[in-house]
Amino acid sequence: MAVSSRNVYYRVWQSFLEGEYYLCVSNEILEEYAEVLSRNISVNVARYIVYAILERNNVRQINPSYKWNLITADPDDNKFVDCAISANARFIVTEDHHFNVLRTIPFPKVGIISIDEFLEKLQSR
């Protein structure tokens, strides 16, 4: 699995492959990954990538037992929030503005950061 070194997300992907951070996913999230990937590549390759992600030691498969429904503008985004809460994740990395509502919710507290902020955290290690 490769991402071009010219791609803005290259460092994020390489850091993932090197085990520099944990990725928490649920079955719903994995299904979305496969769906999004298959828009640009074949369904079989998308499935392979999802399988390869699952094989990494720095992936935590989470089965959220509660749906918080904190994002009303795009309820489909809640799968990421529910997973993050269940995993006790430090933050969600996203560029999706629907997640901004999480900054105003005192409980449960879910941190959100942009990809650029995440890249800064990776570089400061």
Predicted features by range, described:
Residues Y22, N58-R60, G111:
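Conserved beta-strand segments of alpha/beta enzyme cores
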Residues S26-E28, Y33, S38, R47:
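Glycine/small-residue-rich phosphate/adenosyl-binding loop
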Residues I71, H97-R125:
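Acidic, PIN/NYN-like endoribonuclease modules and their adjacent C-terminal/linker elements
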Residues S15, I53, C83, T104:
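Hydrophobic/aromatic ligand-binding patch that stacks against planar heteroaromatic rings
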Residues N58-I92, H97, V101:
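Active-site neighborhoods of divalent-metal-dependent phosphate/nucleic-acid chemistry enzymes
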Residues M1-V25:
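Short, well-structured N-terminal submotif of metal-dependent ribonuclease cores
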